[in-house]
Amino acid sequence: MIENFNDNFREICLNLKIDKRRFILGLSGGIDSMALLSLLKHFIVSNKNLKIEVFPVIIDHDLRLNSSNEAKAVQNIALSLGFNTIIKKIITKKPNGNIQNWARKERRRILCDIAFEFSANLILGHHSDDLVETIFMRSVKGSGIEGLRGMQDRMIWNDTLILRPLIFFKKRQIINYVNSNNVIFFEDQSNFLLKFERTRVRKTLKRISVSNWPSISNDIIKFSLLNKQLLLKINKI
């Protein structure tokens, strides 16, 4: 996985004409972002000539009693790897409903603001399973072509370039990497609560895959790529 990641990230840096070599990393402490932190460390060491700077930013949503302690523990791990790390605590009033959607929007807003302040790009740890879940949720809600394209490996949002170098990797690949390299991470128990839509969708996709459609994830990814190609053609008209 390290070699594939290096090839992917090097292509992003060199072939996509990215001028900035400074990156803000959204670091939650979960398995995906901690794997990405480890991979970035390896990439930086292996490509010193690129002079890459990465600044992890930990968003403390203040939704759990131990969130501050966990954020500090994640910061200490990042510091031990040589990364200057920032903790930002969300102090705005929490909504009564759809807390996950609120947290996602607040997190992205804060990260993009920091990236703009640092004149940096933003790196997020989304993987292909996240992409599949997102497209599935949007399809149920009747989303159009652009929505059914799903998350992209690179996109512009509020003048900030957002990169997702793990978007073509499956969750099981990330788990294998973490286990093989003894990467420390923190499990957010809310990921298993059925009151959240994404958790329910994840379980539904697994049930469909096991019962009668084992290729559903790959088929949804192909569907995403087809929508991306269609949008490119439409935009040329």
Task: Please place each PLM-identified region on the residue numbering.
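ATP-dependent adenylation/nucleotidyltransferase module used to activate substrates
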Residues: 1-137, 172-173, 179-180
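Flexible helical/loop "lid" subdomain adjacent to adenine-nucleotide binding pockets
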Residues: 121, 125-237
